[in-house]
């Protein structure tokens, strides 16, 4: 009897130690796997406390649920501008799951490449003021040496705006977002003259960060001031609470979730040159409400607006197949509604803005990396379907 008691006692102790030690070991050595495992539980709690402004359209809440369930982001903002009124919803916390700071309407996120919409708007404003031209040659504008690749001499402002200048980041190493490598743009612009293009200009659309860095340099040349100061004056950034990020997180910036990142965590910020190189590419921060209000207040300029585009045929029924001068148009097959958008991504954050020509503006900010890039495309299609339904039922 005593031996049986000892045996049972030993088994109990082993099971108890394993139950305590195994989770601790996994949490210590495989923190991402641990946090991924518990995500469904955290998501359930988060969805119990979605916060929306009065009379916010129901589709904003639907978007939040999609962002939590499918985009794997607990801490989110959505903002919608309609008929001169702002509506918004938030989920989660600024400081992580069950934190002390619930997500607010003015909580600060990095906008990532959504910044490019404002860069484009600034360039189009300069063109409307006749300080630049769509046909301005970037080599001539920046007073650079004759290029080794003669095709570089043909690059214009228009080509840079619509990502058709000849840069393909999937083919040629361009160190705009490469760890511990100082980009040559905008601090060593003469390197452009040594660059070999990946395709003949205006024969393809290929997304390019270096192209938008060059647009930032064009603004500085046109106005004789820093890009940041020109942007501050034209957009009145402080009025909207929008600020440029530097080489560290801002004091009021929210905490990002990297559990579905394969490599990066918050350390990434130390290895990229946000301060000197990325300000025109992905350098702005603010809330979803901030960006929709700023876009709604953009001056009504002519002849060019952020909806302007080249009339080269493209597949508007496919995401990322068409580029305007500031935004990407999308119209689902069989539909007549066109939604213009821009997406952004940094480790731990995904962003989108959507606009239509009726004045509706939607922004979605997620403080987490998606599980797969394809998931972010599904969100954009879902946003289109919700906006299409909402606008057409009015």
Curated annotation (Swiss-Prot):
Coiled-coil stretches:
none
Q: List the disulfide bonds.
A: none
Alphabetically list the UniProt keywords.
Answer: Fimbrium biogenesis
N-terminal signal peptide: none
Q: Does the keyword Coiled coil apply?
A: no
| Record-linked InterPro entries | Beta-lactam-related, Beta-lactam/transpept-like, Beta-lactam_class-A_AS, Diverse_Enzym_Activities
Q: Which residues cross the membrane?
A: none
Q: What is this protein called?
A: Putative fimbrial assembly protein FimD, serogroup D
Give the species: Dichelobacter nodosus
């Amino acid at each position: 009897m005593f031996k049986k008691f000892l045996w049972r006692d030993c088994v109990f102790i082993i099971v108890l130690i394993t139950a305590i030690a195994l989770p601790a070991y996994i949490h210590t050595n495989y923190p991402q796997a641990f946090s991924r495992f518990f995500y469904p539980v955290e998501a359930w709690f988060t969805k119990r406390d979605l916060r929306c402004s009065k009379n916010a359209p129901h589709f904003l809440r639907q978007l939040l649920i999609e962002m939590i369930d499918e985009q794997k982001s607990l801490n989110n903002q959505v903002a919608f501008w309609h008929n001169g009124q702002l509506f918004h919803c938030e989920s989660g916390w600024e400081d992580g799951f069950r934190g002390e700071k619930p997500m607010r309407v003015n909580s600060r996120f990095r906008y990532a490449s959504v910044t490019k919409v404002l860069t484009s708007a600034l360039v189009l404003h300069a063109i409307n003021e006749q300080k630049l031209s769509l046909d301005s040659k970037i080599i001539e504008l920046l007073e650079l040496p004759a290029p080794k690749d003669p095709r570089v001499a043909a690059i214009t402002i228009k080509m840079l705006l619509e990502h058709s200048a000849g840069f393909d980041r999937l083919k040629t190493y361009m160190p705009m977002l490469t760890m511990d490598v100082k980009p040559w743009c905008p601090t060593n612009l003469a390197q452009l003259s040594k660059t070999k293009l990946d395709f003949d200009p205006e024969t393809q659309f290929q997304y390019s960060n270096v192209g938008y860095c060059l647009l930032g340099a064009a603004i500085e040349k046109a106005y004789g001031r820093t890009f940041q100061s020109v942007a501050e004056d034209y957009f009145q950034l402080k009025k909207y609470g929008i600020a440029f990020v530097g080489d560290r997180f801002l004091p009021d910036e929210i905490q990002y979730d990297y559990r579905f990142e394969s490599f990066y965590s918050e350390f990434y910020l130390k290895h990229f040159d946000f301060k000197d190189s990325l300000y025109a590419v992905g350098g702005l921060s603010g809330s979803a409400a901030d960006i929709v209000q700023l876009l709604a207040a953009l001056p009504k300029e002519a002849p060019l607006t952020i909806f302007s585009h080249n009339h080269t045929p493209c597949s508007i029924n496919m995401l990322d197949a068409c580029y305007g001068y500031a935004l990407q148009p999308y119209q689902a097959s069989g539909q007549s509604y066109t939604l213009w958008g821009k997406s952004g991504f940094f480790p731990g954050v995904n962003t989108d803005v959507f606009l239509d020509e009726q004045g509706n503006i939607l922004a979605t900010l997620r403080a987490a990396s998606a599980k797969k890039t394809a998931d972010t495309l599904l969100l954009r299609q879902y946003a289109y379907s919700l906006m299409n339904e909402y606008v057409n039922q009015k």
